[in-house]
Amino acid sequence: MANNMSSRQACHAARYVVARVLRGLFWCLKYTVILPLATMALMALFVLWKDNTTPGKLLVKEINFVRQTAPAGQFPVSECWFSSSDSSGRSEIQGICHYRAADAADYVRETDRSLMQLVTALWATLALMYVSLAAITGKYPVRPGKMKCIRVVTADEHLKEVYTEDASLPGKIRKCPVYLPDDRTNRNNGDKNEHA
């Protein structure tokens, strides 16, 4: 009987730990991935709608830019050099950017790199914002809901009064209702309850 109770307690503890880990993972997924990506999608739709632009128009604009900037068979790739100039004792950093002609592979690599930097920076900013708002509003993954409190004691009426008025128990536990199982019910249903 004692082994059965300890295995039940271990099972309940394991389920609690698994539920808590899953709750934490879902919280992280929600506030660091789902909400930022959904916001980015809505922002992209809003920008396209506001400028009366479609992805096709953007492609045509980019193709025309490539044709005007680079010679045939070449693609423009932006290059920036940063130099520090000492003017009047101050060190200022000036960015000097220009376009150079490159092959298709270099153009693809540079475009992917710049888009990835932009998307990653926007995603990280939104994820930080959503996690901060969740922390400020108290939406933590470790908060279990309101738990019910029931104290189980033996079926002695005198003990019921003692347990109900026991001053050594914390206030929250003292306010919990006391449950006194009936010995006859336990003896009759003992086998049923153990296998259920």
UniProtKB/Swiss-Prot annotation:
UniProt keyword annotations, A-Z: Plasmid
Protein origin, superkingdom: Bacteria
NCBIfam families, per the entry: PRK13739.1
Identification of the protein by name: Protein TraP
Provenance organism: Escherichia coli (strain K12)
Lineage: Bacteria, Pseudomonadati, Pseudomonadota, Gammaproteobacteria, Enterobacterales
Underlying gene: traP
